Amino acid sequence: MTAQHNIVVIGGGGAGLRAAIAIAETNPHLDVAIVSKVYPMRSHTVSAEGGAAAVTGDDDSLDEHAHDTVSGGDWLCDQDAVEAFVAEAPKELVQLEHWGCPWSRKPDGRVAVRPFGGMKKLRTWFAADKTGFHLLHTLFQRLLTYSDVMRYDEWFATTLLVDDGRVCGLVAIELATGRIETILADAVILCTGGCGRVFPFTTNANIKTGDGMALAFRAGAPLKDMEFVQYHPTGLPFTGILITEAARAEGGWLLNKDGYRYLQDYDLGKPTPEPRLRSMELGPRDRLSQAFVHEHNKGRTVDTPYGPVVYLDLRHLGADLIDAKLPFVRELCRDYQHIDPVVELVPVRPVVHYMMGGVHTDINGATTLPGLYAAGETACVSINGANRLGSNSLPELLVFGARAGRAAADYAARHQKSDRGPSSAVRAQARTEALRLERELSRHGQGGERIADIRADMQATLESAAGIYRDGPTLTKAVEEIRVLQERFATAGIDDHSRTFNTELTALLELSGMLDVALAIVESGLRREESRGAHQRTDFPNRDDEHFLAHTLVHRESDGTLRVGYLPVTITRWPPGERVYGR
């Protein structure tokens, strides 16, 4: 079957909903659809806890927010994109206020702000510690006012259709029925989130399998800066559930097994009773996660069945503050760790959290393929560089989701197709994909290979090779191992051949793309022979601006081989310098 829309947004999280709203606002005459693997309110945006950064205080400035972001990203951020981001973030948060987002308030009724890691001013808006949930709920309620926006909930996009170099639609499968549909579009926007599930221990929801990255990669768009994987310093052991940075912003301390605030040993300042901006627990995430590794190597972490941990101490904050500003943290600790942070230490360890890399786009979300756009964690614009600052991701998906929506609306209005229907080339692509999906559904496999085993081996390879610290030999081995996993995947089978909610088929389709994304991560890491931000090479321990002040671009050739190149970083105002914290 075939459907047709002017614009299709793939992904129903924060970036996808904001893009769809922007399209409806820009040109109400355009036919818009959202294709989402889950119901929108189950998207991973709901898991963002801490807040959203934007300059609104008289003592703050756009330049300071931009400089914090650029230095936090170890000077790999494109500064034109950063300047656009910080300029537009305030109006996006105010717009959410007008749409009903329940931001936390000061006693005088003004919006409250909290400190966040790497920021020199208090500029992070928050809704207790459920900011992402309230943000997404507000966007979803706003979207529902545009009744003409069609939703394909619980549909999985499997390939993009390309006609004469232009993206003109996609093929998707309905999870509830197994129905395969060709969906034609004048423009497509990818908003499918990150790819944290290529790792075994992550804060990411099960749906974050790099689908949009793989779709773009296979269609011919390059991935950018994929070696930069953010490890958040405070995840609950075993589950990987995030303990928000807001816990440290409100005054939480990180302690080693001796009860010592160990961050003072890693050039992050000296301990103070109250949180100090850009110091100690409010340093950037890459530095805090690296400090954990050093503590472990010194034998100062605590061994548990789920790996080494340190402790997050919130006891001195008291029950009233925790219940007012960190209620979800207390709930998570009780439900998943069986402890009460009001009276007990919280065990934490670094956990894969966010991809700084993604589909290469310009500041309007346009990829190198005409008709294809991307926003949110799927994209790399790049405002995050080598390390994202906490509370920048939510305003990023708002700013660039809106930009991508407006740009796609303009493009679609100028490139609306006639009623002739798809070209013969597009029809052939769609038929080929439908036949492939039918074959995947009937896979019986050879040699007993299982999808779950291949996925587990991929995750183990990524954890070993693309961790907080990396080295050349391990990355080289990882490239070879993932190539072998791709060969094993080709012979794997599935047991469930039904069409109704076939989760085994979904896992197979996800893993196919995950292997491509995983290969891009380790290949990019191998080629970058320096240490910068979240990419730390023990065999190249220094930052090398002469050779690597550039974005890594990875292209996938038609035979599956990768071609790696570099794109200079855009510097407008702030030349590279030392990252200074705690002073």
From Swiss-Prot:
Topology relative to the lipid bilayer, per the entry, is:
Peripheral membrane protein
> Cellular location of this protein?
Cell membrane
Q: Which reaction does it catalyse?
A: a quinone + succinate = fumarate + a quinol; a menaquinone + succinate = a menaquinol + fumarate
Instruction: Kindly list the GO molecular function terms attached to this UniProt entry.
Output: electron transfer activity; flavin adenine dinucleotide binding; steroid dehydrogenase activity, acting on the CH-CH group of donors; succinate dehydrogenase (quinone) activity; succinate dehydrogenase activity
One GO cellular component term: plasma membrane
Q: Which SUPFAM superfamilies match?
A: FAD/NAD(P)-binding domain, Succinate dehydrogenase/fumarate reductase flavoprotein C-terminal domain, Succinate dehydrogenase/fumarate reductase flavoprotein, catalytic domain
Modification Tele-8alpha-FAD histidine occurs at:
44
Matching entries from InterPro entries are given as: FAD-dep_OxRdtase_2_FAD-bd, FAD/NAD-bd_sf, FRD_SDH_FAD_BS, Fum_R/Succ_DH_flav-like_C_sf, Fum_Rdtase/Succ_DH_flav-like_C, Fum_red_fp, SdhA/FrdA/AprA, Succ_DH/fumarate_Rdtase_cat_sf
- Biological process annotations from GO: anaerobic respiration; electron transport chain
Query: Which EC number(s) are documented for this chain?
Result: 1.3.5.1
* Entry keyword Oxidoreductase: yes
A single Pfam family it belongs to is Succ_DH_flav_C
Q: How is the cofactor bound here? A: Binds 1 FAD covalently per subunit.
Which residues make up the binding site for FAD? 11-15, 35-37, 43-51, 155-157, 211, 353-354, 377, 388-394
Q: Which UniProt keywords are listed?
A: Cell membrane, Electron transport, FAD, Flavoprotein, Membrane, Nucleotide-binding, Oxidoreductase, Transport
User: What is the required cofactor set for this protein?
Assistant: FAD
Its family remark reads: Belongs to the FAD-dependent oxidoreductase 2 family. FRD/SDH subfamily.
| NCBIfam families attached to this UniProt entry | fum_red_Fp, PRK09231.1, sdhA_frdA_Gneg
Q: How does the annotation summarize its subunit structure?
A: Part of an enzyme complex containing four subunits: a flavoprotein (FrdA), an iron-sulfur protein (FrdB), and two hydrophobic anchor proteins (FrdC and FrdD).
Q: What is this protein called?
A: Fumarate reductase flavoprotein subunit
Instruction: Tell me which species this is from.
Output: Mycobacterium tuberculosis (strain ATCC 25618 / H37Rv)
